[in-house]
UniProtKB/Swiss-Prot annotation:
Part of the accessory SecA2/SecY2 protein translocation apparatus required to export cell wall protein SraP. The lineage of its organism: Bacteria, Bacillati, Bacillota, Bacilli, Bacillales. Part of the accessory SecA2/SecY2 system specifically required to export SraP, a serine-rich repeat cell wall protein encoded upstream in the same operon. Disruption phenotype: No effect on cell growth, significantly reduces export of the cell wall protein SraP. The small amount that is exported seems to be glycosylated normally. Keywords: Protein transport, Translocation, Transport. GO terms for biological process: protein transport. InterPro entries: AB_hydrolase_fold, Asp2. It comes from the Bacteria. This is Accessory Sec system protein Asp2. Belongs to the accessory Sec system protein Asp2 family. It comes from Staphylococcus aureus (strain NCTC 8325 / PS 47). The keyword Plastid does not apply. The keyword Protein transport applies.
Amino acid sequence: MPRKFRVLQIGGDDLEPIFQHKKGVSWDYFDIGLFEFDSGYVEAIEAIVEAEGRFDFIYIQAPYSETLTNLLQMISEPYNTYVDESFWSVEYEQDENVQKYVVQPLHYRNIEERNNKLEAVSFSGQYGDKVSPKLALVHPNFKGDVVYQGNSELTLSGEFGKEFKPIASWQNNLVYDKDKVIQIWPEFDIDGAVELQYTFRLIQTGADGALIEQIVLTDDMLDSPLEIPAKPFDAYISVTVKARGNGTVHLGPIHKRWSRLDMGQFLLGGSRFVDSQRQEFIYYFHPGDMKPPLNVYFSGYRTAEGFEGYYMMKRMNAPFLLIGDPRVEGGSFYIGSSEYEQGIINVIDETLEKLNFKSHELILSGLSMGSFGALYYGAQLNPQAIIVGKPLVNIGTIAEHMRLLRPEEFGTALDVLVSNEGDTSQASIQALNQKFWQTFQKKSLSQTVFAIAYMQHDDYDPHAFQELLPVLTAHQARVMNRSIPGRHNDDSPTIASWFVNFYNIILEDKFGRVQHAEKQNI
């Protein structure tokens, strides 16, 4: 049975009746009068938490008090607590616990909007997917040049006319999930004097397929994602694109996500960065115990969009930063424009600054595709340690090996090769490989510990560890490694176990953090 989304309301009129139709929501109400008349309220809430788990969302309709913030210290998690704007005050704003748990005011224009907002964000988990440009159908009346570039983009060049005319539609629809605000983010880029017009049609499921709603937006209206309000039924979303003018249009994937409105991307508190070419990465910061180090985890390849590694990193108790790459099919190795890559560096630097940490109080980590991000950006940030499993560094080679060594497997590498270098030639393969090595070899690595778990018979990047080791040796870096028999995807549990083990060793050795229960009891 799916886990319910647990909400605690503190003060105000009990809103549970509004949520009775949402079977996936469990609503608890706390009367603030208990602060004065029932000294056992702490034990009662502790019993609820122990029996049913922590609250996912806390909504406060009560004035600031020290008793209330002491309660929040017991039950709040970062980003999950909102105070009704009518009760928000300077006292809330300046309270240490409010700052620690990133408690924020809930803004709304009327009661209906408030209720809709609370309903919209009350769901467990996270979800996102996309439709690929390779599934787009070019309109037969378009007579210009057409180039499909895998899951990366569909390129249309030529004269589109003075009026908007259809150029492409997707043969696969997006799914509109009932009771969710659905966020839509189309990737596109334009060269020349071209304007685009996207049409999103909500179509009823079932035999009749009736049109429910039509949304038409030009490219300049899509600087922010489209958000379609929650509705009490499932539907499909069809997408068509029109263009006018003259030039080149690059149509990328169309992303669909469950929205948490202004409360976060995927998770409460999640964020996104987008460059001028509409290329994204997502990130989430958890303050942990606010003590060094900051642990950064780059997600691996994942077709379902969202954050990876939350519970693993949270168990370490230290501050952590999750970074994900939702582009192409399951990620694009965290490389892109200089603006995009600088964005990742800035997010890490700004998080260190927020914590008042130095670069030696930083650990970068990742598995498989995420290992590239950890090594590539780690070489530029001078961290205390870089921890990786199944390292992938030669993206060009990974793409090349799809032809004979790994047929029809992990075509994402080809998408990344073409989107970064323009083709699949040998020169482009080497150029993409060198993008990593030119950065990695020219940086000072002597103060960084490298912990690497790798597959002995890796069929993605067979010589990654053997090529990394001489560079690390030349820089006099400290290296810990573990080899596991098998190909790239043969033994993920053992790799993950060594990944966590390396973390435990470094956290204890460098930061005095004892992760093992038997040691903590000594």
